Amino acid sequence: MNVRDNTLIVGSEIIETPPAIRSRYLETRLLAPVFMSYFQEGADWTTMPRPVLSDASFDLSYARDTESTLGGPTEPIEDPQASPFDVGLEMILDGAQCLRLGRDIVINVANQNHALAVEWLKRHLEPAYRIHVVHRMSDNHIDSMILALKPGVFLARHAGIQEMMPEPFNMWKFIVPPEPEPTSFPQYEDDDLVLTSPYIDLNVLSVSPERVLVNEACGGLIRELERNGFETVPVRHRHRRLFGGGFHCFTLDTVRAGDIEDYR
């Protein structure tokens, strides 16, 4: 359902990223007919090296640091098992770890798997695009940590995000909404699989420089966006913590209006 997670659209190129979650390994195959149609129209279609995803593939240091799992639940591999297919640490990265800002791409790196994947992307995309690394802004995805609402304006989880951003983007305006209200979420049992943090509603979708799709249950977020001059479109999505994503996650921007910008 969260089609943005394992795909990165850069210019006219579709890049399938190497997933970290074994159960999502073949997820982009469901999008193959869509990608094929764009390929036949002239788009480039690239797949990053696919990881084996044995226990030895993972850098476990971040998952073992339970105090730093900022993006949501992270499950450590408690007892790694050897496999005849082990190849050592592999490149692993989700498209949702990347924030595209014209010719600049900001990528969250929380472990060595991410760093290897970023090195591949640098060799593949530079110098046409500039790759910037932010360290451990989250465990992986950053689209409930920071989103670009329009050129010059970010929506951020907390004020400290600004210090993590590279120049010149740390000089943009950062809108920090109120903390999420516990009453805006359905109540779940202890054994329910809750996939996201309560900050998932920052995962809004900008459909124009002035208009933002936002969860109707988030009155504080809606008021803060409107106070900053945005038109909000409230949309109902009650069980976003179970579905593991918001409106930004649900969409993949294969078509955009306008030309690529350079904010340098």
PLM segments and residue spans:
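The feature marks the mature, well-folded catalytic cores of soluble enzymes
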Residues: 1-264
